[in-house]
């Protein structure tokens, strides 16, 4: 099992997001501890939940202007 440094991983996640014009609203390690679940707002104003793993955002669920649905999806993905 690969162990990640949570402090530098978080800094890297925010750096990657900033370069893409993404605002991270919340991020939390998934129950497995091997990846992070991210709630964010894209440069187009959409809300999205992503998996952040190995320095990349993946498996996005997009919600046009609906923070409530995105927050519910985030809560489900984190648990």
Q: Where in the sequence are the language-model features?
A:
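A short, charged, amphipathic alpha-helix used as a generic interaction element across diverse proteins
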Residues: 63-79
């Amino acid at each position: 099992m690969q162990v990640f440094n949570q402090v530098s991983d978080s800094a890297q996640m925010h750096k990657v997001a900033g370069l893409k014009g993404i605002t991270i609203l919340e991020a939390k390690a998934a129950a497995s501890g091997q990846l992070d679940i991210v709630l964010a707002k894209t440069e187009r104003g959409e809300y999205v939940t992503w998996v952040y793993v190995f320095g990349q955002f993946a498996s996005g669920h997009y919600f046009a202007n609906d923070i409530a649905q995105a927050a519910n999806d985030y809560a489900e993905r984190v648990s």
